[in-house]
Amino acid sequence: MRNHRTSIFVVLSLVIILNGQSGFLPRAGAESKVHIVYLGEKQHDDPEFVTESHHRMLWSLLGSKEEAHGSMVHSFRHGFSGFAAKLTESQAKKIADLPEVVHVIPDRFYKPATTRTWDYLGLSPTNPKNLLNQTNMGEQMIIGIIDSGVWPESEVFNDNEIGPVPSHWKGGCESGEDFNSSHCNKKLIGAKYFINAFLATHESFNSSESLDFISPRGYNGHGTHVATIAGGSYVPNTSYKGLAGGTVRGGAPRARIAVYKTCWYLDLDIAACSSADILKAMDEAIHDGVDVLSLSLGFEPLYPETDVRDGIATGAFHAVLKGITVVCAAGNAGPAAQTVGNTAPWILTVAATTLDRSFVTPMTLGNNKVILGQAIYTGTEVGFTSLVYPENPGNSNESFSGTCERLLINSNRTMAGKVVLCFTESPYSISVTRAAHYVKRAGGLGVIIAGQPGNVLRPCLDDFPCVAVDYELGTYILFYIRSNGSPVVKIQPSRTLIGQPVGTKVASFSSRGPNPISAAILKPDIAAPGVSILAATTTNTTFNDRGFIFLSGTSMATPTISGIVALLKALHPDWSPAAIRSAIVTTAWRTDPFGEQIFAEGSPRKPADPFDYGGGLVNPEKATKPGLVYDLGLEDYVLYMCSVGYNETSISQLVGKGTVCSYPKPSVLDFNLPSITIPNLKEEVTLPRTLTNVGPLESVYRVAVEPPLGTQVTVTPETLVFNSTTKRVSFKVSVSTTHKINTGYYFGSLTWSDSLHNVTIPLSVRTQLLPYYYDEN
């Protein structure tokens, strides 16, 4: 029997992905480790034939069938061709030299990165003519979730009033530990797990002490949580101990969910997801017939490499060519620049914002001043109690006074029976846990943590009052303590505040652009709510209330977009993944739903720009009728690959047909994205874009430009005319600079408008008069 222990740290590990720490990655064996041998587009429709060809290739390398069989980890045979195998470095180099091999990718490990969201985004079921009801809530769509598994008993997987399984579904439910096919129904229609590559590196995982279930069942609730957000069924009367009350539902509440488990728990607080297992899951999902793939996973940006060595990007490319939109998390390494992950231009990459909701926690000081902090505190009121600031706690160094991290060395006499104020430079998610533990252990009754906004709230163990404020409010409280002989404070339980005056912000943890791999490709693409999202979890998870929990991260924003993509695909089944992305990006809000400026949380807080949120905050209803789209097909992706230096042989194998790159090499600026990013402007640059009409046949659009500061932007022609015979029209954009020095990025926009639609793309331009120059001054 496995020991399925529960710990707060398990929850914390999945709230934030891409935290920049890779120390948990296992060391490879002395002789061999898992490599992905990628062969490009499959050359045969019979999957058994494809797999046999993989074994023959490995046999020819290793010299015997037995060694080939023992080395093989996965065969990719549906969406594309390739395999994962345990190889030494010399074997990997030898097989990489074979002409039929596109490239060999060393296995790497990724990490896993509601009641209000959908009303906030204007996607309410009460409007009979909106996107939800026009698509029957996505009933014929299948959303593939590649994550940490699922808790099938959750109410969000009920199949009440849902019709038969869509006819294009070809997948199934695999049995395993505490999971069998009876756990699937007309909502949860598929469940598989992929562990071979993980086990190749973590052979001891099979021991009885392993936390996780070797099956589609998830030990931690991360996979269940993201599945809820994307396509969970209606569950009324939910809340977290009275906070955020309402009905939990997914973006496409009647869509079907197929779960592909690739993430496994190594320890109480660590999960790892092998890129080879992820790639195998994507291959199976393509075969099974999913319409959308949602991956709340990521890795630090692969700075020295291109997307050819990124397993998710490789699988996503083949999925997109087969009409499947792939939605991925931007990552949680913000607010620093150039931290965005999942940067391949065929992936829809998602940043995270707050909602128009907060959990205010009133604190009344002895001078009757009420401070509204933030917390998820659902305990009883703490009546007027002594308030203390630990001055110089047991150390002669005054710089330690009042710091949350030094509360451990304070005497119990200072904090016992009191509420403690402390200051921190650490991320809130770390400091609050430590400070609450120290104060509670010393007999304190509550803690107020002053620090930089972190956008990550979670309750403290045993409903201990732990309230967050910023430095300004913390300093006010400190002045009150120092100016009063007997300072006191009263802490009331948290309350849910919705709507105005709560503003929308890009979360501080959300990873930022510019794109560190290919600067001319704007990332992230779009933003969606991802802060304090209430959704389902496993019942053994700390901080759950009746199987529901708050989590934050771009992990939560990603399935929000996945649910919207499912609805758009149901409404427009002929739209390509690129057309769907364009519709989402060009119709996004650049202000919040109340018309107010969206800010980006950071140091300092600033107005949000395209490197924070891409096109803006997703606007689902507007995306149904974008008017025009910036579409992409195979030829466009080939242009991109030629422009960034893929060799012709690799491109030919990747796309399954002979390819010759033009000379001179095309510019990546010509790639038909719903954005224009010019990272190195010196001389005037002219670049093309093509728009496809998906609105009224007879349409006339006129251009309006907001040029980035210090640039001149000219569009030719200034008017686009569409009719029954002209559905695609191209235009050119010329950009020049008036700056006399190297600059940072400035931002603007380009909008095509008729009487019904505004088709807006962001402009991001940096002047570089001295090219290839790093300015550290």
Curated annotation (Swiss-Prot):
It holds the Pfam family Inhibitor_I9. Its main location: secreted. Residues 386-481 form the PA domain. Residues 117-624 form the Peptidase S8 domain. The active site is at D147, H222, S555. It is an enzyme of class 3 (hydrolase). It is found in: Secreted. GO terms for cellular component: extracellular region. Its EC number is 3.4.21.-. GO terms for molecular function: serine-type endopeptidase activity. Residues 34-111 form the Inhibitor I9 domain. Residues 23-113 form a propeptide. Glycans are attached at N133, N180, N206, N237, N397, N412, N540, N647, N723, N758. SUPFAM superfamilies: Subtilisin-like (SSF52743). GO terms for biological process: proteolysis. InterPro entries: Peptidase_S8/S53_dom, Peptidase_S8/S53_dom_sf, Peptidase_S8_Ser-AS, Peptidase_S8_subtilisin-rel, Peptidases_S8_3, S8pro/Inhibitor_I9, S8pro/Inhibitor_I9_sf, SBT. Keywords: Autocatalytic cleavage, Glycoprotein, Hydrolase, Protease, Secreted, Serine protease, Signal, Zymogen. Residues 1-22 form the signal peptide. The keyword Metal-binding does not apply. Belongs to the peptidase S8 family. This is Subtilisin-like protease SBT3.7.
